[in-house]
Amino acid sequence: MIEKAGILIEALPYIRRFYGKTVVIKYGGNAMVAEELKESFAKDIVLMKYIGINPVVVHGGGPQIGRMLKRIGKESDFCAGMRVTDADTMDIVEMVLAGKINKEIVSLINRHGGHAVGLSGKDGNLIEARKLHVYRYKGDDQPPEIIDIGLVGEVNRVNVSILDTLAGGNLIPVIAPVGVGEQGETYNINADLVAGHIAGALQAAKLVLMTDVEGVLDGGGNLISSLTVAEAADALQDETLKGGMIPKVQCAIDALQSGVDKVHIVDGRVPHAILLEIFTDAGVGTEIVRYRRGQSVG
């Protein structure tokens, strides 16, 4: 009993610090598949709301999209961690993300006592998007090659008034990462990047990115517990990071530069990873910050 009391006392300063603040959580990976992890995620979100924090959930769905594409005999191709998306693939992406996964998450949270509302970026023009251009650099003396990866977008603008209205109504937004272009075209947007832009637009206290590894790993596979923006940018430049970790770290950098206080990349395979990150001294995963305490900013 004393140990349990100690846990509550440890959480108290964090509850005070984040009361009334916004925390954006990117939900994805194994935490969306294993039943125990799904339950712990939903409980974490509901508890945050009950103690006065405003959680905003942005979800992925890459594996589920991949399985659906495979069922219809369509191959999945990736470039720089992004899914190459033609018109047929976009239809599947939207169906799986906005029509299936989003509603499952809403139902899961509501079943545990929350009041979640599902949205895609097309609802109320929540996420205005433009086509994403990917560049492949060949060398110092050559112009970069522009790679067309189809209907893959990047966030142009987030209409935060919708999210403010939901938060004011004691509701928990659950957002599918589908955006809308100027001509009404639909874009598939990486969920990490959507979460980062939303966190920046809301000036969130924290952005938490859930993944299927311990956090950011170095070249030897060891966990890096803390990175500054400059160190994270170096890791991107020297190709220490691979695959899906690339957009996560880029998202963290963008969010911090947009005013988010701190970003955490956490192991979603750990039950209650969100609560451990926010309400304990040790935390989990990798934290990314603008500068370390005491570091000169120039």
From Swiss-Prot:
Q: Pathway, according to UniProt? A: Amino-acid biosynthesis; L-arginine biosynthesis; N(2)-acetyl-L-ornithine from L-glutamate: step 2/4
Supply the alphabetized keyword list.
Amino-acid biosynthesis, Arginine biosynthesis, ATP-binding, Cytoplasm, Kinase, Nucleotide-binding, Transferase
- What reaction is this protein's catalytic activity? N-acetyl-L-glutamate + ATP = N-acetyl-L-glutamyl 5-phosphate + ADP
Family annotation (InterPro entries): AceGlu_kinase-like_sf (IPR036393), AcgluKinase_fam (IPR004662), ArgB (IPR037528), Asp/Glu/Uridylate_kinase (IPR001048), Glu/AcGlu_kinase (IPR001057), NAGK-C (IPR041727)
What does UniProt give as GO cellular component? cytoplasm
Location of site Transition state stabilizer?
A: 26, 248
Q: State one molecular function term (GO).
A: ATP binding
* GO BP term (any one): arginine biosynthetic process via ornithine
Organism's domain of life?
A: Bacteria
Positions bound to substrate: 61-62, 83, 188
- What exactly does this protein do? Catalyzes the ATP-dependent phosphorylation of N-acetyl-L-glutamate.
Return the NCBIfam families for the record: argB
Please give the family membership noted in the entry. Answer: Belongs to the acetylglutamate kinase family. ArgB subfamily.
What name appears for this protein in its UniProt entry?
A: Acetylglutamate kinase
UniProt organism field: Syntrophobacter fumaroxidans (strain DSM 10017 / MPOB)
**Encoding gene (name):** argB
